[in-house]
């Protein structure tokens, strides 16, 4: 299971950073089905497999932080037996998964407050946190027109469009990326997720920058939604510079903890 998860993350089949972090955390539970002669052997296996999961995508901030937390908390628990160490792993994984899932939900609920009945929203890529925001608005009785860009080359915007089309509250239009400028002018706001924010740079799916620049040109607010843990002050290197966009184009950033104005 761990090897399969590593391969899946490396091939970008899992696209949401929260989903990646949860999958990776749960993958470590597979070590609970194995036998180890000593606690030290178990901890080495935990560290080795966690390192493999982190290396599969070094640019996912949530993946990196949750994996480091898992390993450190298990090794610092001073478990005296292998079953005890495995039990600690189960508890920490459950806690981490709950926190990641609740952060996404809280950020989505906070972002939903920016949406008013009859608004037209432009989305780019597939973000589970943006999906949380839109569905929270729908549950509150808000009807929206949603323009979903395809987000080539993986066409993840198509998945967003298909998912949203299942809700009666949404009037969904799938837009080719090259036509974003035409549709943005009629939108009330753009809403996207994030891989992370490092100092003055937003990292997200390739193609986010031109959407943000076009939104700024036509005066449409560019709202970024995600977990507070994805805002990194420094000491974290995002490896794919093609995913960057300057924070001067963003306003605001909505997280589970706060609304940040830039």
Where are these regions (language model features)?
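Long amphipathic alpha-helical segments
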Residues: 1-98
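Gly/Ser/Thr-rich loops at beta-strand to alpha-helix junctions
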Residues: 18, 121, 125-130
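Ligand-binding beta-strand-loop-alpha-helix segment within the catalytic cores
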Residues: 68-117, 130, 144-186, 190
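Histidine-anchored nucleotide/phosphate-binding helix
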Residues: 127-139, 212
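Conserved phosphate- and dinucleotide-binding cores of soluble alpha/beta proteins
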Residues: 149-262
């Amino acid at each position: 299971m761990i090897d399969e998860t590593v391969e899946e993350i490396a091939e970008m089949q899992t696209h949401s950073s929260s989903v990646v972090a949860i999958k990776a955390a749960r993958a470590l539970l597979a070590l609970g089905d194995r036998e180890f002669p000593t606690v030290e052997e178990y901890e080495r296996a935990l560290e080795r497999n966690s390192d493999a999961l982190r290396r599969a995508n070094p640019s996912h901030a949530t993946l990196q932080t949750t994996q480091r937390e898992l390993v450190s908390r298990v090794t610092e628990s001073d478990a005296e037996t292998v079953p005890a160490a495995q039990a600690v792993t189960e508890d920490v994984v459950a806690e981490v998964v709950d926190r990641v899932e609740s952060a996404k939900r809280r950020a989505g609920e906070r972002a939903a407050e920016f949406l008013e009945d009859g608004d037209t929203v432009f989305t780019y890529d597939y973000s589970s946190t943006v999906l949380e925001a839109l569905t929270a608005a729908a549950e509150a009785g808000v009807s929206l027109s949603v323009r979903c860009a395809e987000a080539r080359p993986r066409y993840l915007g198509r998945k967003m469009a298909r998912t949203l089309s299942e809700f009666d509250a949404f009037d969904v239009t799938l837009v080719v990326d090259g036509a974003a400028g035409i549709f943005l002018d009629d939108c009330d706001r753009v809403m996207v997720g994030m891989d992370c924010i490092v100092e003055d740079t937003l990292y997200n799916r390739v193609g986010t920058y031109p959407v943000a620049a076009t939104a700024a040109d036509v005066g449409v607010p560019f709202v970024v939604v995600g977990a507070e843990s994805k805002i990194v002050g420094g000491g974290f290197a995002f490896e794919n510079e093609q995913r960057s966009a300057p924070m001067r184009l963003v306003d605001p950033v909505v997280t589970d903890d706060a609304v940040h104005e830039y």
